[in-house]
């Protein structure tokens, strides 16, 4: 018998989340949960995969999956084409939300805050450790723009390969990093009967406060 959408559900029983387990600020807890995800989740799940939501000038939301590439006490860093749709949206409205979901651990983290560009030096440092194909792709692909077909894209790649045949590609000005500076971070731990644990951290006057939310 084929399972219907209404019947698709899973009871979460792996773990709980209490205030006693949680530090006063959220970064230590995120580091701990992220380490758990790296050590537990198996392919095809990528522990650093996240959904990034942005808003355009008309107030319409857009979301897509990206990879987290930096984390420190300032915030969460990702890289992209500044001329892409998300880049234009962030230029117009520099706020975003991220969601991480780790199904094996039955955990989710939601992060919201202001977004700013990282320095050109930081962007170049990450660009230079990317695989060569990815570095060339940053030059070749007019991200988010309409192209005729796959052949056009592959032609742009060939032109870029020829351009940099005898020289190491440098980071293009239209490509680089953003850092989300969190103002809110919610940790969600799945629990039985949908009575999930939700601990919410909010940054108020440069200090983090923690509160429990009803599931």
Swiss-Prot record:
Q: Which positions are annotated as binding FMN?
A: 64-69, 79-80, 86, 108, 143-144, 188, 198
Q: Which GO terms describe its biological process?
A: pyridoxine biosynthetic process
Q: So which domain of life are we looking at?
A: Bacteria
Residues reported in the UniProt entry to bind substrate:
9-12, 69, 126, 130, 134, 194-196
> In which pathway is this protein known to take part?
Cofactor metabolism; pyridoxal 5'-phosphate salvage; pyridoxal 5'-phosphate from pyridoxamine 5'-phosphate: step 1/1; Cofactor metabolism; pyridoxal 5'-phosphate salvage; pyridoxal 5'-phosphate from pyridoxine 5'-phosphate: step 1/1
PROSITE patterns from the UniProt entry: PYRIDOX_OXIDASE
Q: What is its EC number?
A: 1.4.3.5
The residue range of the signal peptide is none
Question: Which portions of this protein are annotated as coiled-coil regions?
Answer: none
Keyword tags: Flavoprotein, FMN, Oxidoreductase, Pyridoxine biosynthesis
Pfam families (UniProt xref): PNP_phzG_C, PNPOx_N
Its required cofactor(s), as named, are:
FMN
Q: Which reaction does it catalyse?
A: pyridoxamine 5'-phosphate + O2 + H2O = pyridoxal 5'-phosphate + H2O2 + NH4(+); pyridoxine 5'-phosphate + O2 = pyridoxal 5'-phosphate + H2O2
Molecular-function annotations in GO: FMN binding; pyridoxamine phosphate oxidase activity
How the cofactor is bound: the record states:
Binds 1 FMN per subunit.
Please state which protein family the record places this protein in: Belongs to the pyridoxamine 5'-phosphate oxidase family.
**Self-association state and partner proteins as the record states:** Homodimer.
Q: Which HAMAP family match?
A: PdxH
Its function, per the record, reads: Catalyzes the oxidation of either pyridoxine 5'-phosphate (PNP) or pyridoxamine 5'-phosphate (PMP) into pyridoxal 5'-phosphate (PLP).
Protein name according to UniProt: Pyridoxine/pyridoxamine 5'-phosphate oxidase
Encoded by which gene? Answer: pdxH
């Amino acid at each position: 018998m084929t399972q219907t959408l209404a019947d698709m559900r899973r009871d979460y029983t792996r773990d709980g989340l209490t205030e006693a387990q949680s530090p006063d600020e959220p970064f230590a807890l995120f580091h701990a949960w992220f380490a758990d995800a790296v050590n537990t989740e198996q392919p095809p799940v990528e522990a650093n995969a996240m959904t990034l939501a942005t808003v355009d000038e008309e107030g319409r939301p857009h979301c897509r999956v990206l990879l987290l590439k930096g984390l420190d006490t300032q915030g969460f860093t990702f890289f992209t084409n500044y001329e892409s749709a998300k880049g234009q949206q962030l230029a117009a409205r520099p706020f975003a939300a991220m969601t991480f979901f780790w199904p094996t651990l039955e955990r989710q983290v939601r992060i919201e805050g202001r977004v700013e560009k990282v320095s050109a030096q930081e962007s170049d440092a990450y660009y230079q450790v990317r695989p060569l194909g990815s570095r060339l792709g940053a030059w070749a692909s007019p991200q988010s723009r309409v192209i005729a077909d796959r052949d056009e894209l592959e032609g742009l790649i060939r032109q870029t390969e020829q351009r940099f045949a005898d020289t190491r590609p440098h980071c293009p000005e239209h490509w680089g990093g953003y850092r989300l500076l969190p103002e809110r971070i919610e940790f969600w731990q799945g629990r039985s009967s949908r009575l999930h644990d939700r601990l919410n951290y909010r940054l108020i006057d440069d200090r983090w406060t923690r509160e429990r939310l009803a599931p």
